[in-house]
């Protein structure tokens, strides 16, 4: 891993030790997947997956990518796909990979598992807090929750609230309280004091690095072709 990726992995691991989830929101191409895989491998090495499992929820287009990346970077992890019309739950796998569509339909199935971690990739898929998909993902029980997104806010700050509420339920309060306390002052009034407060209270479990960051630029290869 590159140095900034090691920092991201260590940050997520420290959060996990404290019982905190994480939102890793690095720019696309900076290796969010690799950082999370390193974390899952650490869980395996520490015996945390001896009796529990990890569920990774991804867009359908990323199923095979996740499987191949896990095989390449963490061959010690047992990996199973749960997808397709004849899907069968891989009870012996350390890591189960499924799609948002399956997760939405089978909350009961996943809540019968003992999940140590629930990871969602492209977490902007739950930006609409009232959508059935968002409610389903938030109702899957796990000791630890990790969200990955290169675009945690696409339009409104309430999208951010929805993802943070997945990682740490109720931490930012109810949606209406969040709107009056943060969204309106920041988006409508451009209140810098409120923005500073918001950044401080979310900083412990949100990490975002950009390709334009000086320290990142120095550590990047000449060409980035994939998100790892």
Question: What is each residue range found by the language model?
Answer:
Residues 1-190, 199-224, 228:
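ASCE P-loop NTPase motor core, strongest for the SF2 helicase catalytic module
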Residues 195:
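Long, charge-dense, solvent-exposed interaction surfaces that engage phosphate-rich ligands
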């Amino acid at each position: 891993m590159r140095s900034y990726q090691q920092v991201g992995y260590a940050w997520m691991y420290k959060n996990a030790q404290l019982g905190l989830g994480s939102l890793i929101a690095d720019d696309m191409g900076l290796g969010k997947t690799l950082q999370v895989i390193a974390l899952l491998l650490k869980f395996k090495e520490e015996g945390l997956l001896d009796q529990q499992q990890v569920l990774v929820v991804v867009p359908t287009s990323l199923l095979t990518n996740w499987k191949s990346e896990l095989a390449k970077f963490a061959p010690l992890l047992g990996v199973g796909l749960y997808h397709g019309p004849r899907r069968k739950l891989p009870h012996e796998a350390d890591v189960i990979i499924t799609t948002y569509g399956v997760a939405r339909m089978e909350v009961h199935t996943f809540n019968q598992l003992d999940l140590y971690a629930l990871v969602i990739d492209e977490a902007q898929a739950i930006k609409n807090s009232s959508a059935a998909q968002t409610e389903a993902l938030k109702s899957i029980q796990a000791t630890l929750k990790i969200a990955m997104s290169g675009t945690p806010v696409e339009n409104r700050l309430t999208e951010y609230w929805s993802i943070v509420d997945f990682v740490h339920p109720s931490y930012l309060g109810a949606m209406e309280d969040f709107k009056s306390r943060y969204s309106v002052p920041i988006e409508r009034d451009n209140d810098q004091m409120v923005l500073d407060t918001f950044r401080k209270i979310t900083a412990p479990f949100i990490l975002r690095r950009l390709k334009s960051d000086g320290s990142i630029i120095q550590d990047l290869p000449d060409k980035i072709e994939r998100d790892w």
